[in-house]
Amino acid sequence: MFCVIYRSARREQTYLYVEKKDDFSRVPEELLAGFGQPIMTMMLPLDGRKKLANADLEKVKQALKDQGYYLQLPPPPENLLKQHLESIGKK
């Protein structure tokens, strides 16, 4: 199984995985409108892989099979104040 990964022109660290190059037929129009112009980043074989950098491999495969796409959102921002308060509260 191969996938093609596109990055969003509008949102940093947001990626869209699809099964075939330039085939967005199964991606909802609303999602594409918010995503902006997809910029192809890479083609990737999923078979034989053990993991992906920032996405769960099994979730990606299942989403591609079930809905035809997988949307990778950026990680939540670090809350350094919360981390600091928790660290001094534990001491």
From Swiss-Prot:
Transmembrane segments: none annotated. Pfam families: YcgL. InterPro entries: YcgL-like_sf, YcgL_dom. Residues 1-85 form the YcgL domain. This is YcgL domain-containing protein ESA_01460. It comes from Cronobacter sakazakii (strain ATCC BAA-894) (Enterobacter sakazakii). The lineage of its organism: Bacteria, Pseudomonadati, Pseudomonadota, Gammaproteobacteria, Enterobacterales.
